[in-house]
Amino acid sequence: MIFTRLTRFVGHGTGLRLYATAEKSSLATLRKKTGYTFANCKKALEMHNNDLAKAEQWLQEQAQAMGWSKATKLEGRNTTQGLIGIMVKNNIGAMVEVNCETDFVARNQSFQKFVQAASTACVRYMDQIEGDANLTKVGLNSESLKQIKLEDGKSLADHLALMIGTVGENASLNRAICFKAPESINLTGYVHPAPTEEVPLDVPQFGKYGSILAFKHTSADSNGEVAKKVCQHVVGMKPAKIGDKTRDEPAKDKDDETCLIYQEYLADPSYTVAEVLEANNVEVVDFQRFECGEKIKMDDETVRAVN
């Protein structure tokens, strides 16, 4: 009889330990997956009988509601800092500006991940737009950007509110420019500061400055290296337009030059950009430059409504 009681006691204790271990494992998994606090993850699991899927859904719903509440309270506070995000995938390129209040938040991982998500969402949006034989260029203002959907079906506005709730600071989707190129035209992009390690352009990158260049080239620049350097030049030298030799005259003072083709080439000032392009059989079709915090509104004529 004593043996029977002892067996029952040991068996019951083992069961408790196994349950406690499973509970800790679920808690660790949920914490790692969502990034939410230990207390909130524990509460979610307790409310849903240790069901991970239901607990995660509840946490996301709570975070979304808190994010919208936080975003509403912080709305109107100046957002002069932030990042420029760029992604170029095959024949589609997107550049987006996301702003926040401080440079501290701009370095926050949650904010940076949102910038990457916004860049990816713009590429997906542009992929759904029918292109033609010419370069298609679409500008998106703040309201249009907010409507764009991510893969999870939620809008960028929803994800923005969620991010605001996480970082505790106001943030805003400012603008984006998207390109869709036919086979005859190539795209490249550049952000500054550039990543410390080389990253493929189809992986979203971010920095304080960015540019996208649409170009045509021949075998002389088969890997697009010259075009990449010109894209970097656009960030550094801030040209206002490509320029046309039949209509535009070089500026009297080289420091005042705003035509890309007449500017001294950033990588080698002994040449002009036009000379470098001609020597390598590269033709610039279009370009766009963003600087974080610059006071430039998206031209309404380029804005296309998001369906």
Swiss-Prot record:
Asked if Protein biosynthesis is a keyword of the record, the answer is: yes
Which key words tag this protein in UniProt? Elongation factor, Mitochondrion, Protein biosynthesis, Transit peptide
Q: Where is the transit peptide?
A: 1-19
* Biological-process GO terms, alphabetical: mitochondrial translational elongation
Q: Which GO terms describe its molecular function?
A: translation elongation factor activity
Top-rank taxon of the source lineage equals: Eukaryota
GO cellular component: a single term: mitochondrion
Q: Which CDD domains match?
A: UBA_EF-Ts
Q: Which InterPro entries match?
A: EF-Ts_dimer_sf, Transl_elong_EFTs/EF1B, Transl_elong_EFTs/EF1B_dimer, Transl_elong_Ts_CS, UBA-like_sf
Record's signal peptide = none
> So what does this one do?
Associates with the EF-Tu.GDP complex and induces the exchange of GDP to GTP. It remains bound to the aminoacyl-tRNA.EF-Tu.GTP complex up to the GTP hydrolysis stage on the ribosome.
Q: Which family does it belong to?
A: Belongs to the EF-Ts family.
Q: What is this protein called?
A: Elongation factor Ts, mitochondrial
